[in-house]
Amino acid sequence: MASYVAAIDQGTTSTRCMIFNHSGRVVAVDQVEHRQIFPRAGWVEHDPEEIWSNTRQVCAGALAKADLVTSEIAAVGITNQRETTVVWDRKTGKPVYNAIVWQDTRTDSIVNELAADGGQNRYHRKTGLPLATYFSGTKIRWILDNVDGVRARAEKGELLFGNMDTWVLWNSTGGPDGGLHVTDPTNASRTLLMDLETLDWDTDICAEFGIPTSMLPEIRSSSEVYGHFRERGVFGGLPIAGILGDQQAATFGQACLSPGEAKNTYGTGNFLLLNTGTERVLSENGLLTTVGYKIGGNDTVYCLEGSIAVTGSLVQWLRDNLGLIASAPEIEQLARTVDDNGGAYFVPAFSGLFAPHWRSDARGAIVGLTRFVDRGHLARAVLEATAFQTREVIEAMNADSGVPLKSLKVDGGMVGNELLMQFQADILGVPVIRPVVSETTALGAAYAAGLAVGFWGSEEDIRSNWAKDKQWDPLMPEEKREAEYRQWQKAVTKTFDWVE
């Protein structure tokens, strides 16, 4: 009998496969990084074929590490970096261009053109999103407008669009030989092209963007059997039964299943999601309204989201571009060599600022520098930037929801950094709680798949599987907390109006 569920987690920097048991504990994981391609300033790309090759590799690796055979896996779920855009030929399976990554800002002029009539919130009521370079719609439009011959091919119905969930699913189920062209509402709600109420593509918006609807995948629920893996390959014949965008997957994996429950994922960027139940709350404070999940035929659950572009990737930058650390975990050790930031604040607006500012004209800045500031202070300022940005989003969330946050569930790669977690509790003034399984993104996708095939009986099983690992309570006096935050807010204003 099948005693395990697998999840493919296609992220911004790597692809991995994780295998979970019935208690939601990790049995095995295999992970491979892929190249980050930076053709110009502000441009970020991935090679979709490299990612598909890595996907097959990690599925085989995880199964081998777990010492399991395919028949012991009940189902497979997919979770993915959202918004990242792939356009490919439906007959050959070849991408017409590299994947344009969510952080990429090349579509600024398209955003400005669309915002000229109706402003940044032109599509906000229907989609829950502001016009921004972040979302897939403008990226599809850029590929259609800038890659030779692509628009004509798209209009003839020869090309397909997908985010990474769709790209992995299509290839896993046969590719040009009958591959499924499907997505779920959590991913579709990040394109700027889906109506949040109907959960369908909005033909008027697609027409205004100049995107043929024939390119777009079918939108199905987040938890159902979409199809089966092609017979060739390590997971041959297994049902693919769950799809969730990475941040919604983490929300589901964290068991934030009731209105008012929230989680913050610390990854390449930070993503704070608050469950608002079946109500679509339109933000007045720079947050996104997004689909949280739709489990089979159940009602759609919505979330408010605060997206922060640069957090974990700032640590990467410190390692790769400046060489101040040799590996990401070293930053905590370096930051502990000093007691504070020495008056230095680092605003990592590498690709503008996301929530709650939505300023694509902003660029990164280190302010407050003196001769006193050393490597340790810079390391500390890098970590503190993550916590300060999180507070900005939580204040916007409190204003929109009218419900002050009482505690924060955290997950993702950076939550192993105890200095950061303590500072996060200090700057928020509420407890920060880390679960036993901190990589909840893959777990959420596994839950969605397992529910679809009856491996788990109900969402209550998810809640009962959740367990606390550690809690950090605030220790900083309120007066100091507010003084630090005021300095941060002042630093943020110094990054505006940089790009003409």
UniProtKB/Swiss-Prot annotation:
GO cellular component entries: cytosol
InterPro entries: ATPase_NBD, Carb_kinase_FGGY, Carb_kinase_FGGY_CS, FGGY_C, FGGY_N, Glycerol_kin
Listed pathway(s): Polyol metabolism; glycerol degradation via glycerol kinase pathway; sn-glycerol 3-phosphate from glycerol: step 1/1
Binding site for ATP: 12-14, 268, 312, 316, 413
Record-level GO BP terms: glycerol catabolic process; glycerol metabolic process; glycerol-3-phosphate metabolic process
Function according to Swiss-Prot or TrEMBL: Key enzyme in the regulation of glycerol uptake and metabolism. Catalyzes the phosphorylation of glycerol to yield sn-glycerol 3-phosphate.
Record protein name field: Glycerol kinase
Origin organism lineage: Bacteria, Bacillati, Actinomycetota, Actinomycetes, Pseudonocardiales
